[in-house]
């Protein structure tokens, strides 16, 4: 028995691949990885000991491109699929798991050509174009969101690393706010943090701001100009996001699925700013259920005024009839919404099929 893991491009997809690879290693199952030279795949897995072999193809995404660029991207995908077909055959792969993203294309199609059972993890509440096409052909599609076309869909807990649960805590007071711009940076969140920093620091609230590598120097300059650089924690990115979340009492973040469920597992109340240009507006739908259950606050990017932060803080500090703060209630309920061992459940379901 030997697995191939494929997909990525962004940290959200890759964090799932990592969680599944860790579980395969625990189960004593060998795995190889197939991804792309474009995006973050090599950065995550080029030297990863989780895989016996790693392959990266010259591929790019197809959606949101001009006609001629789409043709070129499709050509690269097809070319890579035939290479992947030979690789899967060479390694005698018995199961393939796709975590989505454009880099999953070649190995997913190669698996179908080689009659290898294909399993898919759909991380978002709205399927990406590749997963929409491949889902009917897959052995099973795992997701933490319920889809109308149930078919071969398996509802499971999101494959979050156990450390997010291990370092979870129930928040009682807002003393520390995390602005999570992500590894790529989010201009709207960076500006939101900057505009609120003077008032927050004056109130004695600590700030940790992860702004992305492209914006780091600019953010350093602006905080320096405000005289706040030595009063806040500013990072381009952070290698230990679990520790950063653990220390925070409130977060401001985009609504990528992995971030949503990691914050949930950690019990960290969050203001989500869905990326407005995400395909099919999937970031909004990723947190729609949370919003309906009063487990988060969602602010559209075009409504992101500085006063919104303090409006949310006031709401979180309000108490119910029993004297419990909304902050504490939400924090506790978040930890109940997601179960541990999502990756383990997925792998064991596949192994027992």
UniProtKB/Swiss-Prot annotation:
Pfam families documented for this protein: Glyco_tran_28_C (PF04101), Glyco_transf_28 (PF03033)
One of the record's GO cellular component terms: plasma membrane
Enzyme Commission number: 2.4.1.227
Residues at which UDP-N-acetyl-alpha-D-glucosamine binds: 10-12, 124, 183, 283
Compartments where located: Cell inner membrane
HAMAP family assigned: MurG (MF_00033)
Purpose of the protein: Cell wall formation. Catalyzes the transfer of a GlcNAc subunit on undecaprenyl-pyrophosphoryl-MurNAc-pentapeptide (lipid intermediate I) to form undecaprenyl-pyrophosphoryl-MurNAc-(pentapeptide)GlcNAc (lipid intermediate II).
Similarity comment: family membership: Belongs to the glycosyltransferase 28 family. MurG subfamily.
Protein's UniProt name: UDP-N-acetylglucosamine--N-acetylmuramyl-(pentapeptide) pyrophosphoryl-undecaprenol N-acetylglucosamine transferase
Organism encoding this protein: Helicobacter pylori (strain P12)
Organism ancestry: Bacteria, Pseudomonadati, Campylobacterota, Epsilonproteobacteria, Campylobacterales
Gene that encodes it: murG
């Amino acid at each position: 028995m030997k697995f191939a893991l494929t997909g990525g491009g962004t940290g959200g997809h890759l964090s799932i691949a990592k969680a599944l690879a860790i579980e395969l290693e625990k189960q004593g199952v060998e795995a190889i990885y197939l991804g792309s030279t474009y995006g973050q795949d090599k950065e995550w897995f080029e030297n990863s000991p989780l895989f016996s072999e790693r392959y990266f193809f010259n591929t790019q995404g197809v959606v949101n491109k001009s006609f001629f660029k789409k043709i070129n991207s499709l050509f690269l995908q097809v070319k890579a699929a035939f290479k992947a077909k030979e690789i899967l055959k060479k390694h005698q792969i018995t199961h393939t798991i796709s975590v989505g993203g454009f880099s999953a294309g070649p190995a997913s199609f190669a698996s179908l050509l080689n009659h290898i059972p294909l399993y898919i993890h759909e991380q978002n509440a709205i399927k990406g174009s590749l997963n929409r096409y491949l889902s009917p052909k897959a052995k099973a599609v795992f997701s933490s969101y319920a889809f109308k076309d149930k078919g071969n869909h398996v509802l499971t807990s999101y494959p979050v690393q156990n450390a997010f649960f291990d370092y979870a805590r129930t928040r009682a007071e807002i003393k520390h706010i995390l602005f999570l711009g992500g590894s790529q940076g989010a201009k709207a969140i960076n500006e939101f943090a900057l505009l609120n920093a003077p008032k927050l620091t004056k109130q004695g609230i600590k700030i940790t701001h992860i702004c992305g590598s492209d914006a780091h120097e600019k953010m350093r300059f602006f905080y320096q100009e405000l005289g706040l650089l030595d009063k806040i924690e500013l990072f381009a990115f952070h290698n230990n996001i679990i520790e950063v979340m653990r220390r925070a009492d409130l977060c401001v973040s985009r609504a990528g699925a992995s971030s949503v469920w990691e914050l949930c597992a950690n019990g960290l109340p969050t203001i989500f700013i869905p990326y407005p240009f995400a395909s099919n507006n999937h970031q909004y739908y990723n947190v729609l259920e949370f919003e309906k259950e009063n487990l988060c606050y969602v602010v559209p990017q075009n409504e992101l005024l500085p006063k919104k932060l303090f409006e949310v803080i006031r709401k979180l500090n309000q108490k119910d009839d029993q004297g419990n703060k909304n902050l504490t209630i939400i924090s506790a309920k978040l930890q109940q919404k997601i179960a541990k061992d999502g990756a383990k459940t997925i792998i064991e379901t596949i192994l027992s099929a």
